[in-house]
Amino acid sequence: MAPAWCLASFPEPKMEQTNHASNVLFVLLGAIMVLAMHAGFAFLELGTVRKKNQVNALVKILTDFGVSALAYFFIGYTVAYGAHFFASAEVLSQKSGYEMVKFFFLLTFAAAIPAIISGGIAERARFHPQSIATFLLVGFVYPFFEGIAWNDNLGLQPWLEATFGAKFHDFAGSVVVHAVGGWIALPAVLLLGARRGRYTKDGNVAAHPPSNIPFLALGAWILTVGWFGFNVMSAQTLDKVSGLVALNSLMAMVGGTMAAMVLGKNDPGFIHNGPLAGLVAVCAGSDLMHPIGALITGLVAGGLFVQLFTLTQNRWKIDDVLGVWPLHGLCGAWGGIAAGIFGAKALGGMGGVSLAAQLIGTLGGIVVALAGGYLVYGLLRATIGIRLDPEEEYEGADLTIHKITATPDRETHW
């Protein structure tokens, strides 16, 4: 008969296998939820742009996801984590294929970068140059900062910990994903210029109201629901999952909605972007904050979006169609800072965070994004061009690029 210690060891591989399988399922569900968020990006843009650009919004988001998958699989994931997929399927499927679903999950984050940018450059950007920009951004620019923040690349995180007592903390990507996406979008929008006819010679703003409020609302709701996978599943293993993340996400969402409702004066566009502003901001500290801190974070984010969207469009004449710079860029940066404020034990948080480290990490993300955005879009504008010509823009991207509109006037019978 085998000794007791030997018998006790027999179930262990089975238990480990079960744990790996559970973690795979957990992360896979998160990846699917965040993948579904890309439908939200598509419908949010579709409902906001004019009718002649609706098809382009749908096609652009899906195409950008495909390009992102290729860029991240072959280049980006290696840049960020030093890992690659040039091994046998037998090796890749170890631990029930956990590393594979982790890649899938992180890919859905990476693909959010061009989805964010898409909303800012809508209605006048050329299709193929944007696909090239997507490949470069997801293959090189985004994973460069992702690796710094989430894989300790280049030694910034150890230095922050040694200097300030804590690393830069971004649990689910307020800065790594949203601020980076929003701050890349800003130079893209500036280099493209405003839509023709948006601003008149006498300084007035020509109104371009949303073409379809129901689709805009649908997009916002899809994003909101998927966000709970974005945040909660960022734990990446079942043993680290926390209900605090879910509740904080909820409270920030509510805070953003209420602030946008009041300051936006019941405007449906503001109200449906309000919860997104709150959720963008809470990503970084959702695992640290007290729910009241998360509520305040969301309230500030909702107000920040409404005020800065109005300023950029009306006073600064920056034609950011969906307001992705204030929504993702500014609210994401606020979220990185808020994690250092409301994550502190003095304000009911879990602690283990430094405001100085949060400020430095957030600023670092902004610098990388601005530099990468100007480099990529500046090179493309100087070489192949990034903007539709006046006639194409007048006709609309749907007819110009895709040869069909969202609602054709007549059918062709063969």
Regions found by a protein language model. Name each.
Residues 8-414:
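Hydrophobic alpha-helical transmembrane bundles of multi-pass membrane proteins
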